[in-house]
């Protein structure tokens, strides 16, 4: 499994609009094959919000299917990125599930070990 974390610093004047756009995006993400989990959260400050979009993907194929060829680039609905001061994306290999053991169970679409060359 692959964890993808989008973080954004959003000025207070744009925070409500940015968060509304991301909430609109959540149902689209949940329909995408291979998405296991998604959570949108924020930490509110006086002048800005720090926003995270935590995604868990079954495998690299599913992640690339959603994010496209350049997985370091955020995939946001039009207009969202312009509301933020900065947006970044990072990826992690989930360690709480042994992909080889899960694949051995015969579960369809069980995650395979991540090909580190693809990162």
What are these regions (language model features)?
Residues 2-8, 39-70:
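Short, well-ordered beta-strand segments in beta-rich or mixed alpha/beta enzyme
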Residues 39-49, 75-119:
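Glycine-rich beta-strand-turn "strand-cap" elements at beta-sheet edges
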Residues 28-36, 56-93:
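An amphipathic, aromatic/His-enriched active-site/gating alpha helix that lines ligand/cofactor pockets
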Residues 21-24, 69:
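Residues within well-ordered alpha-helical secondary structure of globular protein domains
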Residues 9-21:
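Short, surface-exposed ligand-recognition loops at beta-strand->loop->(often short) alpha-helix junctions
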Residues 23, 37-39:
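Short structured motifs
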